[in-house]
């Protein structure tokens, strides 16, 4: 009897004690076979709670690294080892050391969209859904926010009592969403609130009705009385938006809302990774311990 890929995935989950975690930005058919789907914070938190011995991550490499850092005793497999986030590499250790020398009281606040090496040199990690809460809870006057410039600048407007030093990293997907694209969409759909991810540029945030992480955008759209929305984040979120809100309409602002790295993950690659139990995320234990501290601090401060 010929079985489908989905049936094979379910079979392998049971046979090999695998839990599948997927980010909202992967294709809808991959989200459908996942056990847990969410944003970076949700997935980092859930990775510490799952009972299965093996975690298969459908996302980009820093997400798999975070799961391994938090779960050294578990085997973490990536659906695609070449699915990487360019922004994760847009800061270097020399810059962190330079800022620490210049501002002795600085807190290095590291967005989870970063490599394990960068996390190891940071004081605390954040996601877009908990960055405000974490930064507000820090006693430090100076905040060096890495690697994303746009998210850092947005958080700085909400915490005016602190002084921010910014890095020049960015998400190529969110910075490709231009103000004129949003204004054009607003003309076409004048009754649709604009829901925007804070990795977008300030001029896009200015004309948005709501700013939040992917999970917060999903929550807002689900609870809102509005029946149509303009969505300014990666297209993968449209799958879950539609699943939870079949009676509502969601509009993009252009073809650029597409992360080629997230879209590298396919059902075929999921099956292959499960059958071969690789590519496995491995890490030097000294690095893992150093990178673990800021992640654990994030989970504590974000409660």
Where are these regions (language model features)?
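Active-site loop-to-helix "anion-binding N-cap" substructures in soluble metabolic enzymes
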Residues: 1-231, 237-303
